[in-house]
Every structure is written in structure tokens, then in C-alpha cells.
């Protein structure tokens, strides 16, 4: 018998189809007469003995349930181990078993053999006359009888009622899902995606490519890396992930550094936000890694000589409260997430703004973080400008001058520089900086070169069409030198790694 599971241009169901292929391949190892193939638009399954096939698939589903959906944890009050589902799993608990252990309500996970028999019986039943057939909401194909109506357990994008039991509303025509799509959707929870729990919400990262073969090849590159035994995060240490963009930054660094990914895989990530509340109305965002940012990451990582873009750059940045002289951890984590987002979305202007000290807080950049920041600046912006590299020293030294002026006056000049909208406003702020610099005493100017501002003026006039880019570079170097000048030896003892 031959069955086809076709893609339907839906990220959840199509990933489920690719996941079925992975399951079928496992079955092949035990039964050579069972064969599966993956094509760009479908997965083909061939078998002779359906009972033998279902028996083995049921065993695999049972294993996946404990590997991917459920986890054992000690009860905080009693200290007794109990079985709980991971927080983002949108499947209800069922009745506890005879030992008082939690189970899942979906029968395919509680009694996989019987339920798989029912599902494959429906799949292999030929449709009757078209008048009595139903149309699947996901794939659009006709089928005779559903295994279950669509609900959030099999398709998370449905709008939920409080009981988590179905779709809100009474639209009878918008709840039918064929047995094939149900099977793909319900087993997608046992697939190789990324997840991260953040207390009030969880993120699920689902990769997508319209070509199932390419999707399968991409997922094969990272499956072994995922720590699926962790309840809260399967991408490294849970406490070192601050949000969805820092998670992706860490993940792509792994792909480049460990999985030796040389080219941007052209994957669209569907990021599902699951609220930690009774009504699970989810939100789906998309992210696609741009080729330019992938190149910057690859080049920068290749230059690090043992350092880590994530561990030594991102985790080497802190916000410190000036008055209390201590790390402000909530703000630090928000800053790291914001920097990750600005970088991955190719927004250098936004990236620069995150380094501006504000509200009686200053930013600490550890030595390694500063070195890596400079590499990012060069690979991301300076090379793109096409300006000879020797002119970069003019920008850096001018940033040092601005930092010295700001430290001994106030940060208003830096804020003014950040807000300029025209080249005329830019020149006005630079004249004000020059006037303030003259008032500095000899002790304060011995580590800067005031004459460099003349070179800066010549540089900006020569490349005036790029004055905004040069302003951004000047600004981020000013922030970097302000961080150096505000640095205290005890800051180096604050480490969250």
C-alpha cells in the first residue's frame, strides 16, 4: 500500500509532515519492507503489513511523548517526583492513570496503538461520492470522515475557549480537519523545534521552507544539539536566553560555529508566543535571517579566536545603576534582548541607541565585549560604506573626544547628536562639542586628540551622502568610550555566566 502526505503551505502542518517522515524512517530500521521518501511537496509511505507498521509507530509515539512532551520534576512542596507537561504544550491533561500520574487528554498519546489503527483506517478508506465528502481546512482535500474536529491540540492557531476544548464560535464549516492533517498536527508537538519559557509566556520557534526536502536537511543540522530533556529551554542554558531574538542569536551562532553552516539556509521562523494563562490565545510572528546579517555573523565568528559572539559579547554587556552602584538585572536582560533584535533585524540605528546611557544608568562593556563590538561594527557597517579603513581611526578618536566632553559636562550633547535629523543640525552639535572641549583642563585632555575633530569635518564633507551612517558610527564609539571612562574595577566582578 502507498500513502501520500502532501504539504499544504502551512508551517505547522508541513513541519508535521516532515516530522512524520522522520518517524517513518525510524520504523524502516526495524522493518525493511516499509519504505518512506521525502519529496519537495510530499512524503510517500509504502508498506505491506499495516499492523506491523502501526505497532512500531505506536512504540515510537510513546517514546516521543516522554522525550518531548512530558517531564518528571520534584514537587516543590512535597519533594515527590511528578510528571508534568512542558509549559507551552497546548494539549490538556487527561485523567490520571491508576498510579495517580498525569496523562495527556489526546488519545493518540495515551493509547497510541488503538488510535493509530483508527486514524490509518480512516486514511485508507476511499472517499465516497463527492456530495457526502468533507473538505479539510488545512490541505483542502476531500475526505469521508474526520478522526476529530480541529482544535488547538492539533492546530495551535485556532482561537481558544476557556476549556481548551475547541474553536471559539459556531462556524461549523471551519473546524474540519482530515485524518492525515490531524496526525501531522498532533504529532508536531514531538518534533525538533526550539522552545523557551519566560515565566509569563513561552516561545516556540518553528522553522519553515516551502520545500520539504530542504526543510528536512536544515532540521537535520541541529536536531542533535537540542536539549529536549529541559522543561524550560532546549537552546543552551535557560537563564542565558533573554527573549526570542537572543534565542535565535545563540542558535545561529551554534549553526555557524558547530554545525559548520556556510550559507544562509533561507528559513522563515514562525515564532509562536504562548501566554501562561488559562485562555491560550497565541500570537505568531515571523523572522527570516537576512543574508547580510548571516554574512556578518559568519565573518565575525571566524575572527573571534575562541571567544563567543553570544557568551563573550552579549553576556559581557550590563546596565549599572549609578546611584546604587549595582547591576540592574531586569534592565540588563532587556538591553541584551534589544541588542539581539536590532542586530538580527539589520537595524544599526536601533542597535546604536541601545548603547546610549540613560536615566542615571550607565552601560558596562567588558573588555571582550568591546573587542567583539568593534569587529561587528567593521563587518556590519564600515565595510559596507566602502570608506578606506584608515579613516575609521578618525571616527574612533573623535568618539573618544565626545566621550571626554560628555563625562565632564553631561550627556546632553550625546543625546543631541542622537536626535539630529539633517547635516546642518549635525554640524551645529559638532560646533557645540568643540566649544565645550576648549573648556576642558589639560589633565582631562591628555588622553584625547582635540585636533582630530578637524579630520572628522573633512571626512564627513568628503562622504556627505553617508553622513547619517558616519553619525551612527561616531555615536556608538562615543558610547563605547563613555563606558570605558565610567568603568570601575569592581564592574569586572559582575558576571552572570
Language-model segment annotations:
Residues 1-134, 145, 425-431, 435-445, ...:
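N-terminal alpha-helical interaction blocks
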Residues 3-6, 11-13, 32, 36-47, ...:
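Hydrophobic transmembrane signal anchors and adjacent membrane-proximal interface regions, especially
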Residues 5, 11, 24, 47, ...:
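Phenylalanine-focused residue identity feature
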Residues 80-232:
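Basic, glycine-/proline-tolerant helical and adjacent loop/strand elements
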Residues 193-196, 238, 492-496:
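Acidic, serine/proline-rich low-complexity intrinsically disordered regions
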Residues 223-483:
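Intrinsically disordered, low-complexity regulatory regions
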Residues 486-489:
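Eukaryotic acidic, Ser/Thr-rich intrinsically disordered low-complexity regions
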